[in-house]
A protein has these predicted regions:
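N-terminal module of bacterial RNA polymerase sigma factors
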Residues: 1-37, 133, 191-196
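Short, charged helix-capping/linker segments at alpha-helix termini
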Residues: 3-4, 20-29, 39-58, 164, ...
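Internal acidic/polar
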Residues: 8-9, 98-125, 152
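Sigma70-family region 2
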Residues: 20-21, 47, 58-75, 95-96
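Structural recognition of an alpha-helix C-terminal capping motif at a helix-to-coil junction
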Residues: 40, 54-61, 74-86
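Arg/Lys-rich amphipathic alpha helix in sigma70-family domain 2
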Residues: 68-71, 82-102, 121, 173
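DNA-recognition helix of helix-turn-helix
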Residues: 89, 148, 154, 158-185
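A short pre-motif secondary-structure segment
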Residues: 142-146
Length: 196
């Protein structure tokens, strides 16, 4: 379970249950904790930070207004991302846009250390993004959820509303294609491309 020190060790699910009983502070903490990563996830769909922020806010508002008890065998984060995905797809249906991953990944980069290391890390991320963009949109999304968000297969299945075999196959194929693209470019530091 996900725990957090500032709320006396309560998990996200416990905080959400407190919110369902009327504790708005518990939900405010969940918003603060998940807003940035949720916005980054939505960016994989809409490629516009302002729109992603609006959809994230809309997702939280949906939860506030509806106060639904979801299936607590899944994490709160899975439930939240499922709502956000639905809202992002609704937006795309209206706008008929393409799904992108680049900005969401760059927003997750934590550059620490000296300037030379920062430059090398940024160069590697730019190379990774360029390689990921060669993948089909379906593969871009599973790579982002699995490697950059840390979701488990079961959670990805729930978020994308697809079967476990399809999810595993998509991740496997995406990794295989990434490895192929990296070898074709052969100018990357092999140690850095550990996800392949």
């Amino acid at each position: 379970m996900e725990t957090c020190e500032t709320t006396n060790g309560k998990s996200d699910i416990e905080l959400y249950k407190l919110f369902l009983k009327g504790d708005n502070d518990a939900f405010n903490y969940l918003i603060i904790k998940h807003r940035k990563m949720l916005t980054n996830f939505i960016m994989t769909y809409v490629k516009n930070i302002e729109i992603a922020e609006d959809i994230a806010q809309d997702s939280f508002m949906y939860m506030i207004i509806n106060k639904v008890e979801y299936d607590f065998k899944y994490s709160f984060k899975t439930y939240l991302y499922t709502i956000a995905k639905s809202r992002a797809l609704n937006y795309l249906k209206r706008k008929k846009r393409t799904i992108y991953v680049e900005d969401a990944i760059l927003n997750n980069v934590n550059l620490e250390g000296n300037i030379e290391n920062e430059f090398i890390i940024k160069e590697n991320y730019n190379a990774l993004i360029k390689t990921i963009k060669k993948l089909k949109n379906e593969y871009q999304i599973v790579i982002y959820l699995y490697y950059f968000q840390g979701f488990k297969y079961k959670e990805i299945c729930k978020i994308l509303n697809q079967s476990m075999p399809k999810t595993k196959m998509a991740i496997h194929r995406a990794k295989k294609l990434l490895k192929k693209f990296v070898k074709e470019d052969n100018n990357y530091d092999e140690g850095w491309w550990s996800i392949c």
